[in-house]
């Protein structure tokens, strides 16, 4: 007999789990649409050439791409994010009206390490805006993140930076261009591995000891600086551009009333090579999950590269991990039922079928009907285990008086109510 098991890094979600996951998805959709975003769906299966493009995830992500061949021997890949497919859609549809704000919620795949809230098949919830140069777009996406997590009763902080600032700092201390990406990947891990860990990491990447010392000394001096201080500390045009954008973003965050819940982090990099400006990561305030639960940033070069005109198409996005949000919520929240009311017929199946259908047609109630013919005690036990708040018990006596027995499962109380006014009691 075949051994039944899931592929490592994948998971089945049973109904009591999926109820909460659907709640998160609906909260995302509702919030995204409140900000004027339009829905989009892209294929899970893509050409490998697209997913491995140099302006995409960079060398690190190439190791995690799931690849396959079709019967025509074409090299294909499962998408590892929703950003590159979105950029492809914009590049293929030059008549899209800009600015274009889209959201997509879908499965992505990465053959990477597995940890709490992180799987190899997972769902991302993305919003991207193309056609806006102003960092007002970043501010709006950050405000949207706070609204989404407020809806889900989760408190967050957002760390942010600007890649122009970071690239300018490295340029000003004479880090060679070909080593910049390696240094950025090391600096991006500073909160996890500390300054000594950064030194060790850059040395392992082939950086000289002298250069490693320069990097570490620069990091230590930068940690004491405010955003405005960087202009004086580093006489570099990229640093100046980064500071200007960061100061403008900060003004918008103050105007939106969210600045106090954000943190400027000069070494936040979002390792991916595609980012050109603002970058940010979202964390739970209580750190019940230590990894980020959302992230994003500005990437102005990808669409132009795909279209072959190498023009800038100003684009900024944000992405939330549904699975890691689910992990956070499942630690705090009692799983709610899929039904509001459960109807138990006692020899009155036909009439109960009609009553259930009438309630579904005339109210917004979610109604489940006892179909298995269980005795009253077993049916009530089922409703209790499923956290269904109300039960209707309908026998011949009730039908003869046009009433039903309404049982409040939380309180354990019962009352007879007229069928005609049933919806008022639920």
Swiss-Prot record:
<keyword id="KW-0067">ATP-binding</keyword>
<dbReference type="GO" id="GO:0004821">
    <property type="term" value="F:histidine-tRNA ligase activity"/>
</dbReference>
<dbReference type="GO" id="GO:0140096">
    <property type="term" value="F:catalytic activity, acting on a protein"/>
</dbReference>
<dbReference type="InterPro" id="IPR006195">
    <property type="entry name" value="aa-tRNA-synth_II"/>
</dbReference>
<dbReference type="GO" id="GO:0016740">
    <property type="term" value="F:transferase activity"/>
</dbReference>
<dbReference type="GO" id="GO:0006427">
    <property type="term" value="P:histidyl-tRNA aminoacylation"/>
</dbReference>
<keyword id="KW-0436">Ligase</keyword>
<dbReference type="InterPro" id="IPR015807">
    <property type="entry name" value="His-tRNA-ligase"/>
</dbReference>
<keyword id="KW-0963">Cytoplasm</keyword>
<comment type="similarity">
    <text>Belongs to the class-II aminoacyl-tRNA synthetase family.</text>
</comment>
<keyword id="KW-0648">Protein biosynthesis</keyword>
<dbReference type="InterPro" id="IPR004516">
    <property type="entry name" value="HisRS/HisZ"/>
</dbReference>
<dbReference type="Pfam" id="PF13393">
    <property type="entry name" value="tRNA-synt_His"/>
</dbReference>
<keyword id="KW-0030">Aminoacyl-tRNA synthetase</keyword>
<dbReference type="InterPro" id="IPR033656">
    <property type="entry name" value="HisRS_anticodon"/>
</dbReference>
<dbReference type="GO" id="GO:0005524">
    <property type="term" value="F:ATP binding"/>
</dbReference>
<dbReference type="InterPro" id="IPR004154">
    <property type="entry name" value="Anticodon-bd"/>
</dbReference>
<dbReference type="GO" id="GO:0005737">
    <property type="term" value="C:cytoplasm"/>
</dbReference>
<dbReference type="InterPro" id="IPR036621">
    <property type="entry name" value="Anticodon-bd_dom_sf"/>
</dbReference>
<protein>
    <recommendedName>
        <fullName>Histidine--tRNA ligase 1</fullName>
        <ecNumber>6.1.1.21</ecNumber>
    </recommendedName>
</protein>
<dbReference type="InterPro" id="IPR045864">
    <property type="entry name" value="aa-tRNA-synth_II/BPL/LPL"/>
</dbReference>
<comment type="subunit">
    <text>Homodimer.</text>
</comment>
<dbReference type="Pfam" id="PF03129">
    <property type="entry name" value="HGTP_anticodon"/>
</dbReference>
<dbReference type="InterPro" id="IPR041715">
    <property type="entry name" value="HisRS-like_core"/>
</dbReference>
<keyword id="KW-0547">Nucleotide-binding</keyword>
């Amino acid at each position: 007999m075949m051994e039944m098991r899931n592929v490592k890094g994948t998971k089945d979600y049973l109904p009591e789990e999926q109820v909460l996951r659907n709640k998160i998805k609906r909260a995302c959709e509702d919030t995204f649409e409140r900000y004027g975003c339009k829905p989009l769906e892209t294929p899970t299966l893509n050409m490998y050439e697209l997913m491995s493009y140099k302006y995409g995830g960079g060398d690190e992500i190439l190791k995690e791409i799931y690849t396959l061949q079709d019967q025509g021997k074409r090299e294909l890949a499962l998408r590892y994010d929703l950003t590159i497919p979105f950029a492809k859609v914009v590049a293929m549809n030059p008549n899209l009206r800009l600015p274009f704000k889209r959201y997509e919620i879908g499965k992505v795949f990465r053959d990477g390490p597995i940890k709490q809230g992180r799987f190899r098949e997972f769902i991302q919830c993305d919003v991207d805006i193309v056609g806006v140069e102003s960092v007002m777009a970043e501010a709006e996406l950050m405000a949207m993140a706070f609204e989404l997590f407020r809806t889900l009763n989760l408190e967050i902080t957002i760390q942010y930076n600007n890649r122009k600032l970071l690239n300018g700092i490295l340029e000003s201390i004479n880090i060679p261009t070909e080593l910049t990406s390696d240094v950025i990947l090391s600096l991006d891990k500073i909160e996890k591995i500390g300054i000594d860990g950064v030194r060790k990491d850059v040395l392992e990447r082939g950086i000289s000891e002298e250069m490693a010392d320069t990097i570490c000394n620069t990091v230590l001096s930068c940690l004491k600086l405010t955003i405005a201080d960087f202009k004086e500390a580093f006489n570099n045009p990229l640093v100046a551009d980064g500071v200007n954008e960061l100061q403008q973003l900060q003004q918008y965050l103050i105007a939106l009333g969210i600045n106090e819940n954000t943190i400027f982090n000069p070494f936040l990099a979002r390792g991916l090579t595609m980012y050109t400006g603002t970058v940010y990561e979202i964390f739970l305030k209580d750190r019940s999950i230590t990894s980020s639960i959302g992230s994003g940033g500005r990437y102005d070069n990808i669409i132009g590269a795909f279209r072959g005109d190498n023009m800038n198409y100003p684009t900024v996005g944000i992405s939330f991990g549904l699975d890691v949000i689910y992990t956070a919520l499942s630690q705090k929240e009692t799983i709610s039922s899929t039904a509001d009311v459960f109807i138990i017929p006692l020899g009155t199946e036909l009439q109960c079928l009609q009553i259930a259908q009438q309630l579904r047609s005339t109210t917004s109630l979610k109604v489940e009907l006892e179909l298995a013919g269980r005795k009253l005690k077993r049916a009530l036990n089922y409703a209790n285990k499923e956290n269904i708040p109300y039960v209707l018990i309908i026998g011949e006596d009730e039908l003869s008086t046009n009433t039903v027995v309404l049982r409040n499962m939380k309180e354990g109380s019962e009352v007879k109510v007229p069928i005609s006014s049933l919806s008022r009691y639920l």
